[in-house]
Structures are given as C-alpha cells and as structure tokens.
Regions:
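Solvent-exposed, non-transmembrane regions of membrane-associated and secreted proteins
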Residues: 45-301
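Gram-positive cell-envelope targeting signals
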Residues: 1-77, 279
Length: 301
C-alpha cells in the first residue's frame, strides 16, 4: 500500500510540475503553457517526420518494383488473356510497357536522366484526367505524399499524336527522388559540379512513350513564379501547341530570355519539345524550376 501511495505521489508531483495547477502564480502558469505548447509542436513534428519518411520508404519500394518491371530485371508473367486484351487495346505499344499497363492504364511512358547504371531520374510517367490526382497518388492508386510523375492532361499522348511540347510534372523530394535533382542544373546553392558543370555531364533527357523512343537535348532552365504577388509570371504552360512559326519562335525567345544557362542547341519550328516542371521551395511554395529540351532530330547526333 505504501508503494502505491508513493507512486501516486510521484505522478502527482510530475503533473503539478508540467500542468497549470490551482495555486500557481501567473508566471508559473505561463511557463507551463509555453512548455506544453512546445512539447505539442515537437510531438506533432516528430509524427509528421516519421510519417513522411515511412511513406517515402514505401513509395521507394514500390518504385523499385515498377522499375524492375519496366527494365526487365524482374521475372514478369502476364496472364495470356490479359496480354491479348492489352495488345488489342494498344496495338502499337512497345512491349516493355505491357506489365505496367496491366497495373494502370494511365501509364504513358518512362523518363530517364543520368548515368545508365545509376540514373538520377528513372520514373514511370502517367497521364490522368487532370493535373491534380497524381500529385498525391502512386501508380497503384494509393495515397502518396510523393505522387507520380505525370504528363499534362490537356495534350494527350497517343499512337497518332505526339504533343508539340510534352509537359511533365514531378515532385522535388527531400530524399532526392523524382525531379529533385533537376535543380542541380541551377547553381543557386553555389555547389561544385552544379549549374553548367551538371549540364555538361547530363545534357539529355530520355523519354520513351508507349509508342516511340526519344532523346531530348536540354537547351534551357529557368526559375518561374506562378503567382503575380511574387513578381513577373511567365506562363510556360501555355506553350503546349503552336499554331504557326511565329508562335513557336516567340515562345522559345521568351525561354531563352529567362534561362539561367546557355547551350549551343539550335531550335526551329516543327521541333518537338519537352518541359520538366518541379517545385523549388528555397524560393517559396509557388516557385518552380523548369527544364526545357528539344527532341533529337532524325540523323542528328
């Protein structure tokens, strides 16, 4: 009984020390409230951090599985009936996409950048019915903080149509996945091997759709405001199609006026473009870092 009373007294003393108590002076009540507020903030922050990295770890595991399906490092067996159905639905599809289409028919391609044996971008690309869903959903349709790389829904990528400018969106994830390392083309942190050094090492983008394989030469990169309150807004998303040469030339000129680095890549009306867009939180929640590429022409190195 004595031990029980002693334990009860210990808990009571702890409670009186931590929580406002009858008889406390105003200064003591303020101290306890500040302490409790800080403790709540710390606990919530820890829960959010654990949740983020736990979710990211799950997403990374899923991405590894998806990558093994596409690159053929996993043993893949598609049900013959299902395969026949997919081939009938997508008669011109490159066969390496069939296992991914079996999982999700929004799949439209695969993007790769970097060294062949250790790319810094290596992701499946989907195209949905809007530009919102895949911001926070993975390929399986489950909620995901890191989402999935996706193409702008307004210009459909089909066997018959390759948009004049394919626009892809991907998150800038703290752990370095998805489009995080695109910001290395921008030497805003004055890191060695960033900016032009990074461009010289990795000057191209490989984007294979269900129907064609393409390499793009990077020709520009820029920091973009999306809200007028933050300064000039360049509506780079409007350059999805070009009604004539003048429209194309004007769009390219505006890009080259704003780029943070310069290349010797030439452009002409009729070239297919690719645009990669990601957030760059160092400049605010509404800022974007955007990379532009031009498809390698037939017969060009």
């Amino acid at each position: 009984m004595a031990n029980f009373v002693e334990k009860e007294n210990i808990f009571l003393r702890i409670a009186k020390y931590l929580f406002p108590w009858k008889g406390d002076k105003p200064a003591e009540i303020i101290r306890k409230c500040i302490f409790l507020g800080a403790a709540v903030v710390l606990i919530v922050s820890l829960v959010m951090i654990i949740s983020f990295y736990g979710s990211t770890a799950q997403d990374n595991k899923l991405n590894e599985q998806i990558s093994s399906l596409y690159h053929g490092s996993a043993s893949v067996t598609i049900d013959p009936v299902k395969k026949d159905e997919l081939v009938k639905e997508y008669p011109e599809v490159n066969e390496e996409f069939l296992p991914l289409l079996e999982q999700n028919k929004d799949v439209i391609g695969w993007i790769t950048m970097g060294d062949e044996d250790s790319p810094f971008v290596d992701n499946v690309v989907v195209q949905g019915d809007d530009n919102e869903y895949y911001l926070d959903h993975n390929l399986n349709g489950d909620y995901s903080k890191t989402g999935t790389v996706f193409a702008d829904y307004r210009e459909k990528i089909t066997a018959e149509n390759t948009p004049a400018n394919i626009i892809l969106y991907g998150h800038n994830v703290n752990t370095g996945e998805y489009f995080a390392r695109l910001t290395r083309y921008f030497n805003y942190r004055t890191q060695l091997n960033y900016g032009m050094d990074w461009y010289r090492k990795y000057p191209t983008i490989t984007f294979n759709t269900l129907y064609r394989k393409s390499t793009y030469k990077i020709f520009a990169g820029m920091l973009v405001n999306t809200e007028e309150k933050d300064g000039e807004v360049f509506y780079y998303l409007q350059g999805r199609k070009f009604k004539n040469k003048a429209a194309f030339d004007d769009y390219v000129a505006q890009i080259l006026d704003r780029t943070t680095f310069y290349t010797d890549v030439d452009l002409k009306y009729g070239d297919n473009l690719i645009t990669l867009s990601t957030c760059i939180l160092d400049y605010g929640i509404d800022a974007r870092w955007v990379i532009f590429g031009r498809e390698v022409r037939e017969g060009e190195d």
